[in-house]
Amino acid sequence: MIEREPRSSAAAVSTDGAARLRAVRSVMLDLDGCVWFGSELAPRAAEVVAELRARGVGVGFLTNISSGTTSHVADKLTRLGIPARDSDVLMPIEALAGHPLLAGSPQVYVLGREEVATAVARVARTTTDDELADLVVVGRDPELHYADLAAALHVLNRGGPLLALNLDTRVPIEGGRIVPGNGAI
């Protein structure tokens, strides 16, 4: 049995953590509920990102939000105090092109904001006719209408698959509040 001497000071932990951090070349940070809460940065988020960058660690940002674009997300980060470029951000909208459900040019009924429909239209044919749609792509839309839900359900009841851009049922926002996420649909 190997016994280790107990760590008695925070300095020892910090030194050990710093040694481990020196081996890290890049990190990907989740945004919603980690780096930010709605329109508020998490405490010390900007300082942590600045420190990582000062140490030469590449910093990228992941989000599974399906509204907006990488440009919107990078602009929001910058506005909140964390300088970011579009290329620093990965979103599910950008991953659509490689999804097997979109191979073969199906007609897609989009349940989501305009930017989701635009992203889908870059890689597949979109339709607003639930009789013609082969599948449903769903992205978060706080202004979702019941008629759109009913149309999407019709596609699914006819056997069309559902491609959800994320499964989060709730999204943490400023003030400790929670709002329904894409997975709630």
Predicted regions and their residues:
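HAD-like aspartate-dependent phosphatase fold
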Residues: M1-L31, V35-I185
